[in-house]
From Swiss-Prot:
<feature type="binding site">
    <location>
        <position position="346"/>
    </location>
    <ligand>
        <name>substrate</name>
    </ligand>
</feature>
<dbReference type="Pfam" id="PF04996">
    <property type="entry name" value="AstB"/>
</dbReference>
<comment type="function">
    <text>Catalyzes the hydrolysis of N(2)-succinylarginine into N(2)-succinylornithine, ammonia and CO(2).</text>
</comment>
<comment type="pathway">
    <text>Amino-acid degradation; L-arginine degradation via AST pathway; L-glutamate and succinate from L-arginine: step 2/5.</text>
</comment>
<comment type="subunit">
    <text>Homodimer.</text>
</comment>
<dbReference type="GO" id="GO:0009015">
    <property type="term" value="F:N-succinylarginine dihydrolase activity"/>
</dbReference>
<keyword id="KW-0056">Arginine metabolism</keyword>
<dbReference type="GO" id="GO:0019544">
    <property type="term" value="P:arginine catabolic process to glutamate"/>
</dbReference>
<dbReference type="InterPro" id="IPR007079">
    <property type="entry name" value="SuccinylArg_d-Hdrlase_AstB"/>
</dbReference>
<dbReference type="InterPro" id="IPR037031">
    <property type="entry name" value="AstB_sf"/>
</dbReference>
<keyword id="KW-0378">Hydrolase</keyword>
<dbReference type="GO" id="GO:0019545">
    <property type="term" value="P:arginine catabolic process to succinate"/>
</dbReference>
<feature type="binding site">
    <location>
        <begin position="132"/>
        <end position="133"/>
    </location>
    <ligand>
        <name>substrate</name>
    </ligand>
</feature>
<feature type="binding site">
    <location>
        <position position="237"/>
    </location>
    <ligand>
        <name>substrate</name>
    </ligand>
</feature>
<comment type="similarity">
    <text>Belongs to the succinylarginine dihydrolase family.</text>
</comment>
<feature type="binding site">
    <location>
        <begin position="19"/>
        <end position="28"/>
    </location>
    <ligand>
        <name>substrate</name>
    </ligand>
</feature>
<feature type="active site" description="Nucleophile">
    <location>
        <position position="352"/>
    </location>
</feature>
Amino acid sequence: MPLVEINFDGLVGPSHNYAGLSLGNLASASNAGEVSYPRAAALQGLGKMRHNLALGLTQGLFAPLPRPNPVFLGALGLNAIDEVDQAQRRLRAAAWSASSMWTANAATVSPAPDTPDGRCHLTAANLVTMPHRSQEWPDTVRQLRLAFADAAHFAVHDAVPACFGDEGAANHMRMCKSHDAPGIEIFVYGTTGGAFPARQHEQASRAVARLHGLAPERCLFVEQAPEAIAAGAFHNDVVAVANERVLFTHEQAFANPEATYAAIRERLPEAEIVVVPSSVVSLADAIRSYLFNAQLLTLPSGEMGLVIPVEAWETPSVRGWLEAHLASNGPIRRVLPVDVRQSMANGGGPACLRLRVVADPATVDPRFLLDEARVAIVEEVVRRHWPEQIDPADLGSDILAQTVHGARGALLAALELSELA
């Protein structure tokens, strides 16, 4: 079978909560302390996966990581249920975080057509800027090495050293004539100095490119606009997304946009760059609606579709631009709203929830691939075992810890993934 793009969505974990742990993530901050609905959140995510399967796309799934994380707590001299003070409460909340559902941060992926050994390379992201995410990568690597165990087709690398912050595919884009053709890889980094941290370090991006053996002339290292980070674009995928020959971006996404566009066109002459001007959609509206945190996909018909959160369609300026684009000869021919409101309330849209891997599905462990029957199996597990709701004040409850642990165990049993238990 030829190489195709597979979107591996992270299933929203049973400990999904709104503890407000993510500095620079406006949605996370604004919903801190609210009651979350893990069961509804997971079902919404599965609804998006089913939606994309119905489009004729190849869909994968990653399981939630173990939470509350005893390794993380033990390293801090804490446990999951003891009484703690206010400062320690945030550390404990980090150990309960379900943030691994945003698999765009799981790894950076370079497919076989771009690499010298003809294998797909994946480097786990260290996510060191945020404590609640910094604990993820060892368990993420375990899952990646299971899903992509075929060493003839995949190479999975450990995270780069923690002194260089790496946020994975959320700050990486690939452009190409087609998914199975050689492409260019665009690494987007930030610079420090603003009110919010620049999570992606340039040296982390360059290290990943070296680990993957990418040809320097096929790589671009581009600075994210400081004003975008300051406005709440904590990852580049909040203000830009690419698919095959198309870059879809806000006017204020990059520090030097014209130089960025010129460098892309020099390396990929057929590139089509769709820029949304700030005079039509403000940076604030783009970030609030998550217009660009969308899945830009090549459909089986060959046309491109944009899977957006319903919040984007409900934002007048965004809807106006999308309707005008659909009426034009632009490359995006379908706009497909989906409901992932529970994830959105924590700062994660459709693009955050998936990791794109270009590969032959036959080379992937089939336990990580979905069809309608497997979606139904996972939905049944979620309905039976995921908590209906969690108040952040509940974090630390022994009963809740047992419920969360049991829910994940039931999922792994249903998917026959006992290696991850």
